[in-house]
Regions:
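N-terminal start-of-chain detector that recognizes signal peptides
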Residues: 56, 79-84, 93-95, 133, ...
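Catalytic-domain carbohydrate-binding cleft regions of carbohydrate-active enzymes
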Residues: 2-156, 163
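Solvent-exposed beta-strand/loop surfaces of large extracellular or lumenal domains
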Residues: 135-155, 260-292
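Generic detector of short, aliphatic-rich beta-strand segments that form the cores of beta-sheets
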Residues: 159-162, 294
Length: 294
């Protein structure tokens, strides 16, 4: 019930922040009972609709991860997002934390909830593995766990931090209706500092055919080390709509010497434009400190 189920419509900033939080919820719906033209719809906030659209578009982008987490919740009851103290139980500093949460296992969400806020303090929980780090989702800046960082924010901001070991599948093609559209270009963000795995789940999204095996579970496993190894293992008979895959691997140290797929070296591009034009290959972004593979 984004915006409130009944009562007066919220002011624009509050509505934007409400949407920015709601996009990570299992059920996301903007509606109310009002019939007197005070119903909370995005187009009622003409000066804020850009930020509302950006947030909703981001939820669509995250839909491969969201759907996979929903299937996991169905199987074992683990919520798609949890308070930080549930994930980092050995860090007492998280016990009083009541706003930030983990979306899945590896994405820390720190929504802006104070009116007019320009700086958002974010506590990055301590981890048991000393090799783990947190990375700003947007800039890829690296942070050690167990500290509070100050994040500059504006009305468009949704502060996010990627935890070491993250495997976050996203849609590389724009989506607007999941009943009629599918992810055809799969983008996977990884932070391969530590060993990790994530199971991407797909089915037709409409029927119960998955009960008869019409699903596809793709286990994506990362083996960290001097040589990073990523493996994909499939289970199920559902035919995926994915036609292309793009890996974005946070690699802070330096560019790798080579990248192989099934034992065959991919071409290395020094210029991003040529990489974007190529059908396959890899490129190292100095700005983002990441290896980009397709």
């Amino acid at each position: 019930d984004i915006g409130g189920f009944f009562g007066p419509a919220p002011e624009g900033e509050l509505f934007v922040r409400w949407v920015q939080n709601g996009i990570f919820q299992p059920r996301f719906s903007i509606h109310s009972t009002n019939t007197d033209n005070t119903v909370t719809e995005p187009w009622m906030y003409s000066d804020k609709k850009q930020y509302i659209k950006e947030a909703i578009d981001f939820r669509y982008k995250l839909s491969p991860t969201l759907y996979s987490l929903m299937e996991r919740a169905h199987e074992n009851g683990l919520p798609i997002w949890q308070p930080t103290f549930a994930v980092f139980q050995n860090d007492p500093a998280t016990y009083d934390e009541g706003v930030d949460f983990m979306f899945g296992d590896s994405l820390l969400v720190a929504n802006v909830v104070e009116k007019g806020q320009t700086v958002r303090p974010v506590y990055l929980p301590k981890t048991e593995n000393e090799n783990e780090r947190f990375y700003d989702f947007y800039t890829r800046e690296e942070y050690a766990p167990g500290q509070t960082v100050e994040v500059p924010v504006d009305i468009a901001s949704i502060p996010l931090f990627v935890r070491s070991g993250a495997i976050i599948p996203m849609s590389g093609n724009a989506l607007h209706n999941l009943m009629t559209e599918k992810t055809t270009a799969l983008d996977i963000l990884m932070a391969p500092d530590v060993d990790s795995a994530f199971t991407l789940y797909e089915d037709d999204g409409r029927t119960n055919d998955y009960r008869n095996g019409a699903y596809l579970k793709t286990k994506i496993a990362v083996k960290a080390g001097v040589k990073t190894v990523v493996t994909f293992t499939n289970e199920g008979s559902y035919e995926t709509a994915v036609e292309s895959m793009y890996l974005d691997m946070i690699h802070r140290e330096k560019s790798p010497f080579y990248v192989q797929v099934d034992g065959k070296e991919l071409p290395h591009f020094l210029h991003r434009r040529k990489f974007e034009q190529a059908e396959s290959g890899w490129y190292y972004s100095q700005r983002l400190k990441s290896v980009q593979i397709k």
